[in-house]
């Protein structure tokens, strides 16, 4: 009887470990040019596979250069109440990829990595950016049926400050930091030292995208450790 009892305890213990480790970590990478140019297969996937196991991660990248947040947030309007004819096209394609790659899969954590904002800054739509980003997160929570999504925001670099071409540039940086700071599951990543020499808006400086990848991975691991125990 004692032997049976011990075997039962061992069995339950093993089940608990399995249950705790069950599921895969889903990483969603989205945004405009600096996310589109980011070589995730080289600078992101190997690191998260090493951290969690190649069979324990799903990575989906959906990005396109020069796109405003309205291509993701479906209810986007300008401060004047103007609305584009079409919204949410890139969001729809992202969700389609998620559904395809996660069908029948138990998801342990979701981390949304966002690198976007240049287009909205240049267009003068900084004043509605926070509202739009929060709306985008609500879309994700609803469509993924999760309230525990981790968020990483790649803050705009200091490119616009150096060029002095857009007085709204610093305002957007502050908005992005506030969005991260107000959410316990979010953080922002500094990119000021990653500017390229020729096209300084993009991170083509030697090792720029590699360093960006390292920061994404470090931030993601920290958020997952803190929030998805």
Predicted regions and their residues:
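Cell-envelope and extracellular/periplasmic
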Residues: 20-229
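Sec-dependent N-terminal signal peptides
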Residues: 4-13
